[in-house]
């Protein structure tokens, strides 16, 4: 081998060595590029807590508490005045000794502007042996102060019934109280009251009529018109004149025939 050939072979070997080195380097670079770097996985944070929801309102309505039952108001009557007097009533002296009931009845009717003659009213009353049913006695001839079957007079029911025929709202009552009397008078309504004589006492007597009906009577039965009161007295009209007596005196006399009266109702 010539020196020139040897030199050529040496160059070829060097060139091959360089190429091999270059290929090796290129392979390393390719390996580094193709293998991705292991990146750290992203840290998964803790889930944020869900926002707290407000409580769902209940659908059931809250009812207000029931009010406590209150007592019903009690109707109160107006207090009675301490005194009153009916002054615009006129009276007259009775025509017949035994005719006090008819005399008082027509005076009472006149107060309500109803004109009735005493004699007319008297003879329109039915006759009976029972004063609860009609007039007992002969008004033109008999005297006062007896009891049935003798001449006597008449009680409240026949008087009220006849007054109603004159379109007056007359009502016969018994067992009235002094408060009832004051209430009527305070309303401006006079009262026909059955008493004994001039506000005296007499013993009540039970009798029986021909039909066997019992009735309480008293000697000297009399009728007046009550027109006023104050704290201690009752005022009444008798034969057109006015008188005042202690309330207790009136009540004693009035009680004999059971607190009997005719009122405007």
Model-derived regions: residue spans:
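Mid-length scaffold segments of soluble, non-membrane domains
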Residues: 146-179, 184-186
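A mature extracytoplasmic/lumenal domain signature
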Residues: 104, 174-177, 195-199, 228-230, ...
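Active-site-adjacent structural segments surrounding the nucleophilic cysteine of cysteine proteases
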Residues: 28-158, 197-199, 204-208, 214-217, ...
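Structural recognition of the beta-strand scaffold that forms the well-ordered cores
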Residues: 99, 171-173, 191-195, 225, ...
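A short, structured loop/turn motif at beta-sheet edges
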Residues: 183-189, 228-233
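N-terminal secretory signal peptides that target proteins for export/translocation
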Residues: 1-9
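Noncatalytic regulatory segments and standalone regulatory/sensor domains
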Residues: 148, 201, 205-218, 223-265
């Amino acid at each position: 081998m010539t020196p020139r050939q040897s030199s050529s072979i040496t160059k070829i070997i060097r060139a091959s060595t360089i190429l091999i080195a270059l290929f090796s380097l290129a392979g390393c670079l390719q390996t580094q590029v193709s293998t991705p770097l292991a990146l750290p996985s992203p840290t998964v944070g803790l889930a944020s807590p869900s926002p707290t929801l407000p409580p769902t309102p209940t659908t059931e309505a809250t009812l207000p508490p029931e009010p406590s039952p209150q007592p019903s108001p009690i109707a109160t009557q107006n207090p009675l005045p301490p005194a009153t007097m009916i002054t615009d009533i006129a009276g007259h002296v009775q025509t017949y000794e035994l005719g006090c009931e008819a005399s008082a009845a027509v005076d009472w009717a006149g107060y309500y502007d109803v004109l009735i003659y005493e004699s007319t009213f008297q003879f329109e009353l039915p006759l009976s042996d029972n004063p609860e049913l009609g007039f007992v006695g002969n008004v033109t001839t008999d005297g006062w102060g007896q009891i049935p079957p003798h001449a006597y007079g008449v009680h409240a029911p026949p008087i009220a019934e006849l007054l109603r025929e004159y379109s007056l709202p007359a009502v016969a009552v018994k067992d009235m109280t002094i408060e009832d009397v004051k209430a009527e008078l305070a309303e401006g309504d006079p009262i026909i009251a059955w008493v004994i004589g001039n506000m005296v006492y007499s013993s009540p007597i039970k009798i029986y009529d021909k039909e066997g009906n019992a009735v309480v009577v008293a000697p000297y039965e009399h009728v007046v018109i009550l027109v006023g009161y104050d704290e201690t007295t009752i005022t009444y009209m008798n034969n057109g004149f006015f008188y005042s007596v202690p309330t207790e005196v009136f009540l004693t006399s009035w009680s004999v025939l059971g607190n009997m009266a005719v009122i405007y109702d």
